[in-house]
Amino acid sequence: MAANYNNSAWFYDSLARLVYGKALVNAQIYLLKHIPENGKVLIVGGGTGWILDDLAHIHPSGLQITYVEIAPNMMALSRKRNVGNNQVTFINDAIENVDLPADFDIALTPFLLDNFTDENLAKVLNSIAALLKPNTLWLNTSFQLTGKWWQRIMLKAMFIFFKLTCGIEASKLPGIDKCFEEKHFKLVEQQSFFGEFIGTRIYQK
């Protein structure tokens, strides 16, 4: 069920920069201002882990980060990141297989949820939601379609490419906003990047 980008670890960041410039990075950095000092942070699907470097720049110490990533090669790159004096627990597994206490202050899912079918998206969302405290913020970044013709072409090309190279299950975007709404999360902030093809959302439990 889980999307696994293990085969793309060595070229993923370079490909992202080639296609999107800094848009993928900027969309995620935009959300980091919401990470609380001394917070307990859950990151699911962190990829190559560059976001840990940026978190350490903002919060050099005090964070307790649990970093869940299913792809071993991605995890190997993530472990090499500069985390400052923050405490990081690396878990190389799918989030639905992980047993953690339900005491996280904030969750980040960068380009994770758009990899699943609607059925499996609901399961993944439930697994993460169960680990969050009441009123917790969930910071999500995903691709989105806003009616521009080129977005569908790029999206289809991405799904075909990563289905062939990494075996992702999705062939179209799932209903991410709808799924959050059904789980009674409140949308509190949103921002778009790269011609509205990339959307960041902040939800509150």
Predicted regions and their residues:
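Class I SAM-dependent methyltransferase SAM/SAH-binding core
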Residues: L42-N97
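N-terminal, positively charged/glycine-rich alpha-helical extensions of SAM-dependent methyltransferases
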Residues: M1-F11
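Conserved alpha-helix/loop element of class I SAM-dependent methyltransferases that forms part
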Residues: G21-N38
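A short glycine-rich, Lys/Arg-flanked "PGG" loop and its adjoining helix->strand segment in the class I
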Residues: A122-P134
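Core SAM-dependent methyltransferase catalytic element
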Residues: K183-F185, E189-K205
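A conserved beta-strand element that flanks and buttresses the S-adenosyl-L-methionine
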Residues: L108
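C-terminal alpha-helical "lid/dimerization" subdomain adjacent to the S-adenosyl-L-methionine
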Residues: T141-K183, Q191
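Short glycine-dipeptide loop
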Residues: E37-N38, L132-W138
